[in-house]
């Protein structure tokens, strides 16, 4: 094999004495490959999907299988030259020892996967492209083989401490969003164009569809060492941000269409001016909020990597910390401004919508230039759009509940219960996804001790994912108590904190998170077994289900409180 400069590429490995085999030195001179396609891949500096010939993969050199180096070669040496930058050549993502697929224990079943293209017959995704067996680069003269990377072991206490601050920040962000929604519900646009309430969960859910998915993908990339190279890192960041803007614009437009349809069904009334207003407000809000939050998210991921914090623990909560507040404030401001222009400057709304839609082809071109995000442009729409529809149904429940003057107090708590549930389940999904990327290959699950069936297997066990589920569930009650008391101190909402109200509210919150965590455990493993990337597919569904479950359980709680006569302060006064 040669790099772009035409020099031969060699593998150099040496084992430590502790490995039991003494020092061994293998030098493998690979055949020169002259191919324009290969050189283009080297020059692109972006991880790509390709299929490696099984004959080359299992070529026997000096009596030793390349794919089956003995256990004596578990520690590999690097040659460092000051004028060269090296990129890694690693198989840790799909062939880690804990899955039973160690190089020294190749079986016929494992050999079948050696030449397998993980995109054939399966849903390709950005992380799939990012985590293939080998990365090719043109920056170094040598290809270096490294041992499998592992996330440092963390106790439940360390995990809880890392999650605590981002969790509280995210919680206070949702509290702020709830208080803002409690205020803006009295604005003219929310009173006269009630379909805006249907937009609220769908647009707030963009943090689950886009921001948290971005955070999870980049967290996985950091944990498996795919953002160590500055060029690879910025290629992934730029491609992901462009992709996210495409998705935000499309989802914003479709959310407006869903709000128009769901708002028309109950009463059968349709207003063209209101429809244009909804489309303009939704598209503009989705675009601006997604861009701001995406930039913040990239900063969080890069900062976590530099400080040595596991980004799986902090990225997804911080992605949502002020996301709800930013999105809701932008939606209220834009929709109210466009509503005030309906009579005198009626052409402003369609121009705003057309402007942001016209930018979509530019973002598509940028995202398509990066192979790691090009696949998501084709295969990543199903979960995003489906999640938007699910969140819109939750918005319809909110719109119907707010229409009842006795239940208007639900507004301030809706972003809180939805946001907290979505944040916690996104952390769990991101952690499970990283675990699977490090311990197995797509389509196969790692060997795990058999336990009881769902939902209890999620919470009972000694595995790292069991511990994280337990820790996250324990955050629910103290977290919500803090946020409820904060709302009470700010004198926001229309509901007094009676004992009965707190008990009923906490029961709904615990039931929501308990349900989401075991669904996440089942869903992430199911997507992995089907060869789909859980980072891109599971989190949109889970956060949308969190919105739907949270809104529905909260509405039932307020109905129950009203029926049993708990109207102190009055519920919904």
Swiss-Prot record:
Record membrane topology: Multi-pass membrane protein
Gene Ontology CC entries for this record: plasma membrane
TM stretches of this protein: 163-183, 196-216, 246-266, 283-303, 314-334, 348-368, 377-397, 407-427, 470-490, 499-519, 544-564
Subcellular location: Cell membrane
Residues with the Phosphoserine modification: 137-138
Gene Ontology terms for molecular function: inorganic cation transmembrane transporter activity; monoatomic cation transmembrane transporter activity
Stored Pfam families: MgtE (PF01769)
One of the GO BP terms on file: nickel cation transport
Reactions mediated catalytically: Mg(2+)(in) = Mg(2+)(out); Mn(2+)(in) = Mn(2+)(out); Co(2+)(in) = Co(2+)(out); Ni(2+)(in) = Ni(2+)(out)
Function per UniProt: Acts as a plasma-membrane magnesium transporter. Can also mediate the transport of other divalent metal cations in an order of Ba(2+) > Ni(2+) > Co(2+) > Fe(2+) > Mn(2+).
Protein name, as recorded: Solute carrier family 41 member 2
Organism this protein belongs to: Mus musculus (Mouse)
């Amino acid at each position: 094999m040669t790099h772009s400069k035409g020099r031969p590429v060699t593998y150099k490995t040496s084992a430590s004495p502790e490995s039991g085999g003494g020092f061994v030195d293998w030098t493998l001179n690979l055949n020169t490959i002259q191919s324009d396609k290969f050189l283009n891949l080297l020059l692109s500096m972006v991880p790509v999907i390709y299929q490696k010939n099984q004959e080359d993969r299992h070529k026997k050199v000096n009596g030793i299988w390349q794919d089956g180096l003995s256990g004596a070669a578990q520690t590999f040496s690097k040659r460092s030259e000051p004028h060269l930058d090296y990129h890694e050549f690693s198989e840790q993502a799909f062939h880690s020892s804990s899955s039973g697929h160690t190089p020294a224990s190749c079986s016929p079943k494992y050999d079948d996967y050696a030449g397998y293209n993980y995109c054939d017959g399966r849903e390709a995704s950005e992380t799939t492209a990012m985590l293939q067996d080998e990365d090719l680069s043109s920056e170094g003269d040598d290809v270096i083989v490294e041992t499998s990377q592992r996330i440092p072991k963390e106790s439940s206490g360390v995990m809880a401490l890392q999650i605590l601050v981002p969790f509280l920040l995210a919680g206070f962000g949702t509290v702020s969003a709830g208080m803002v929604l409690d205020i803006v519900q009295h604005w003219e646009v929310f009173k006269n164009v009630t379909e805006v309430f249907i937009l609220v969960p769908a647009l707030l859910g963009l943090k689950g569809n886009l921001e948290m998915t971005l955070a999870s993908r980049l967290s996985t990339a950091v944990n498996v060492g795919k953002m160590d190279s500055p060029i690879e890192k910025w290629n992934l960041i730029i491609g992901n941000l462009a992709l996210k803007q495409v998705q935000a614009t499309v989802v914003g437009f479709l959310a407006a269409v869903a709000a128009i349809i769901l708002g028309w069904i109950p009463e059968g009334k349709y207003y063209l001016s209101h429809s244009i207003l909804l489309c303009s407000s939704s598209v503009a809000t989705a675009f601006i909020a997604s861009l701001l939050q995406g930039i913040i998210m990239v900063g969080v991921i890069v900062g976590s990597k530099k400080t040595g914090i596991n980004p799986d623990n902090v990225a997804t909560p911080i992605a949502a910390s002020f996301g709800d507040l930013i999105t809701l404030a932008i939606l209220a401001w834009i929709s109210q401004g466009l509503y005030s222009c309906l009579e005198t400057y009626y052409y402003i709304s369609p121009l705003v919508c057309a402007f942001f839609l016209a930018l979509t082809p530019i973002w598509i071109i940028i995202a398509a230039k990066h192979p790691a995000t090009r696949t998501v442009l084709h295969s990543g729409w199903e979960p995003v759009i489906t999640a938007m529809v699910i969140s819109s149904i939750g918005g319809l429940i909110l719109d119907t509940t707010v229409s009842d003057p006795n239940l208007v107090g639900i507004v301030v708590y809706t972003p809180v219960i939805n946001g907290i549930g979505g944040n916690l389940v996104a952390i769990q999904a991101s952690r499970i996804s990283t675990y699977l990327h490090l311990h197995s290959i797509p389509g196969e699950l790692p060997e795990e001790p058999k336990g009881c069936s769902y939902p209890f297997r999620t919470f009972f066990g000694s595995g790292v994912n069991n511990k994280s589920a337990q820790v996250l569930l324990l955050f629910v009650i103290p977290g919500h108590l803090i946020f409820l008391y904060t709302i009470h101190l700010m004198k926001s909402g229309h509901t007094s904190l009676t004992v009965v109200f707190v008990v009923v509210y906490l029961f709904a919150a615990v039931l929501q998170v308990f349900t989401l965590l075991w669904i996440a455990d089942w869903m992430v493993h199911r997507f992995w077994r089907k060869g789909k990337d859980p980072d891109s597919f599971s989190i949109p569904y889970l956060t949308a289900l969190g919105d739907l479950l949270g809104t529905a359980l909260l509405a039932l709680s307020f109905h129950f409180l009203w029926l049993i006569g708990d109207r102190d302060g009055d519920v919904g006064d």
